């Protein structure tokens, strides 16, 4: 039997833990959006219903799987699942069929909270700002992960805040 595809959680988190406000992103970071695209392209992407609605459409070149408790929620071009186990099972099946090397998870806060204990890798963007917001990244145990060297980026024309890309791999 083939090993399960690794589970990769992807998030942008402000210095104060905020990840969004009123169901939307609260910063403009084109460099981070390009990284998100490269991390998810050709892979299944699991997200909650509110996150999907904030994006408003399926992500091109990816298989979008939306977690929802509403059986009537069936947007065109995405798959839905009623709970995390079903979503991850579907994502792993779809990922294996499409030749993906991982399953990615793109939020929101409640989905992150459920996935953190299961994630093999975290791909985090630490946004160096302290915005107001109503969605927070959950507390997590950094000692359970090994950090790769961080990649710092200054604010610039395409990025309204300085930020750091950081990869964390779960300890064996």
Language-model features: where?
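Enzymes that bind and transform nitrogen-containing heteroaromatic metabolites
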Residues: 2-172
């Amino acid at each position: 039997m083939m090993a399960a595809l690794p589970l990769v959680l992807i998030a942008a988190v402000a210095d104060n833990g905020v990840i969004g406000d009123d169901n939307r992103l609260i910063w403009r970071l084109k460099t981070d959006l390009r990284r998100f695209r490269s991390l998810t392209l050709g892979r299944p992407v699991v997200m909650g219903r509110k996150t999907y609605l904030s994006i408003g459409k399926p992500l091109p070149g990816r298989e979008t799987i939306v977690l929802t408790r509403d059986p009537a929620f069936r947007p065109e071009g995405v798959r839905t699942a009623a709970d995390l186990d079903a979503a991850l099972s579907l994502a792993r099946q779809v990922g294996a069929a499409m030749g993906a090397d991982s399953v990615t998870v793109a939020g929101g806060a409640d989905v992150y909270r459920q996935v953190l204990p299961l994630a093999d890798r975290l791909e985090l963007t630490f946004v160096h700002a302290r915005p107001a917001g109503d969605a927070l990244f959950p507390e997590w145990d950094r000692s359970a992960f090994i950090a790769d060297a961080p990649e710092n980026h200054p604010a610039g024309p395409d990025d309204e805040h300085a930020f750091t890309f950081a990869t964390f791999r779960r300890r064996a």
